[in-house]
Every structure is written in structure tokens, then in C-alpha cells.
């Protein structure tokens, strides 16, 4: 078996571009802002792409403290957390329990909304793709706390590094409100560095203008 290479932001950006996960252009977001790029982690839908993403999460988690359980919010976070658990085991020789939540509670079988590793009394890291408004993360944090977990932190694939409704970004708001660290595999700055290195002047200028208007 070939040992996976360590995660590198540029390699991930190139893979994201090749899969259509990341696009540069003009995109209207739900917020109404016209963004010069769009990121859709749902298109990381093959083994190579998912493996590279999971390697990034796993590498980052080995630098974090208090990793008792890793948790993927339904639905998109479920394959991410499962693949990350595999990467932690195969690459870092760390067997970390993992779990996820259902959108709707079951009243038979396992029951409830939580599936997988027990979280009561555990320090839990949440793994997701992005934090846009922070609503979904807050909901998951509430579910986990109600189950007796301590939230150790959140890992996301992309930090857009842009303000929400106020002066803080959605990630900064979550960090301040919930008093937990939030780490990202790549940031808007990484995207801009990539464009600069590739000589993509028009796309870079659009990113710079957007960051001046909405950046943190």
C-alpha cells in the first residue's frame, strides 16, 4: 500500500479546481454578495479527492489537543469524518472514535439523533466543509453539549475570511461566542497566493477587490 503524502494547500487547490469543487468567476451567494469564487465540497465525490481532504483533516488533528472523538454533522460531514478516522489510523497510527448525527431522531434501533462513538464526557472535534453563517455548527454544538460532550474545536476545509453581518467573520463569531478554536485547511489568502503564483492577474484582481470590500 502506498503511503499517502502530507496535505499541501496548493495540491488541494489544484485538485479542487480539476473537480469543479473550486471555481473562479462571478457567483451570487445566498447572502446576495457577488463572489469571485465558489467552493462546493460536495463535489469531492471520488476516492482520490476524499482521501486528500481527509489527509488534511488528519494532519491538522495531530497538531490539536483533546481529540477524544471526531464528529461529522449530517449530511456532508459524515463521509468527511469517516475518511478522516481512516487517515488517522493508516497514516498517523491513531485510532480515534468517530460519530455523526441524524437530521431526524429514530425511535427504534439505536434511537436518538447521535450515531457512532459515545460522546458523553468526551472532548469532541467537529469536522465540516465551511462555516458560512454558523447556524449549522451552533445546532450541532447544542446537540453534542446536550449529550454531555465538551466541544474541543472545529475543523473546516475553507475559511473565506470575510465579514458576516458585523465586523467579524462567521468563523470569528463562532470562536468568540462558543469559546472554541476553529481551524481551516485552506483560506482565501491561500487562494490568492495560488493565483499570484500562477500569474492569473484578472482572477487575483477580482479576489483582491472582494477582500477589500468584505475581508477581515
Swiss-Prot record:
It is an enzyme of class 2 (transferase). Its EC number is 2.4.2.10. It catalyses: orotidine 5'-phosphate + diphosphate = orotate + 5-phospho-alpha-D-ribose 1-diphosphate. Keywords: Glycosyltransferase, Magnesium, Pyrimidine biosynthesis, Transferase. One of its GO terms (cellular component) is cytoplasm. Its cofactor is Mg(2+). Pfam families: Pribosyltran (PF00156). 5-phospho-alpha-D-ribose 1-diphosphate binds at residues 30, 75-76, 102-103, 106, 108, 128-136. Pathway: Pyrimidine metabolism; UMP biosynthesis via de novo pathway; UMP from orotate: step 1/2. Orotate binds at residues 38-39, 132, 160. GO terms for biological process: 'de novo' pyrimidine nucleobase biosynthetic process; 'de novo' UMP biosynthetic process; pyrimidine ribonucleoside biosynthetic process. GO terms for molecular function: magnesium ion binding; orotate phosphoribosyltransferase activity. SUPFAM superfamilies: PRTase-like. Catalyzes the transfer of a ribosyl phosphate group from 5-phosphoribose 1-diphosphate to orotate, leading to the formation of orotidine monophosphate (OMP). NCBIfam families: pyrE. PANTHER family: OROTATE PHOSPHORIBOSYLTRANSFERASE 1-RELATED (PTHR46683:SF1). Homodimer. Belongs to the purine/pyrimidine phosphoribosyltransferase family. PyrE subfamily. This is Orotate phosphoribosyltransferase.
